[in-house]
Amino acid sequence: MKSVCGVLIILVVLTTMLSISTFSTVGAEADCPISEAIKCVEKCKEKVEVCEPGVCKCSG
């Protein structure tokens, strides 16, 4: 069971990083750090409008 949990955790991390890289190229600013992007994604789900250091705005 431990190996299954480990695989699931890795999948979640990879999915999160992929979604962050998508946001950084599509809607968010290039100077948005990864930690800030993670907070924005958690806060806004898939509706991040602005992501800058210390600033996170959701669209819609």
Swiss-Prot record:
Subcellular location as annotated: Secreted
Disulfide bond positions: C32-C51, C40-C56, C44-C58
Family statement drawn from the similarity comment of this UniProt entry: Belongs to the short scorpion toxin superfamily. Potassium channel inhibitor family. Alpha-KTx 29 subfamily.
Tissue: Expressed by the venom gland.
Record's function text: Weakly inhibits the Kv1.3/KCNA3 channel (1 uM of thetoxin inhibits currents by 13.2%) and Kv7.1/KCNQ1 channel (10 uM of the toxin inhibits currents by 27.7%).
Keyword Secreted: yes
Gene Ontology CC entries for this record: extracellular region
Name of the protein in question: Potassium channel toxin alpha-KTx 29.2
Signal peptide: 1-28
Keyword line: Disulfide bond, Ion channel impairing toxin, Neurotoxin, Potassium channel impairing toxin, Secreted, Signal, Toxin, Voltage-gated potassium channel impairing toxin
Molecular function terms from GO: potassium channel regulator activity; toxin activity
Primary site of residence: secreted
Domain commentary: Has the structural arrangement of an alpha-helix connected to antiparallel beta-sheets by disulfide bonds (CS-alpha/beta).
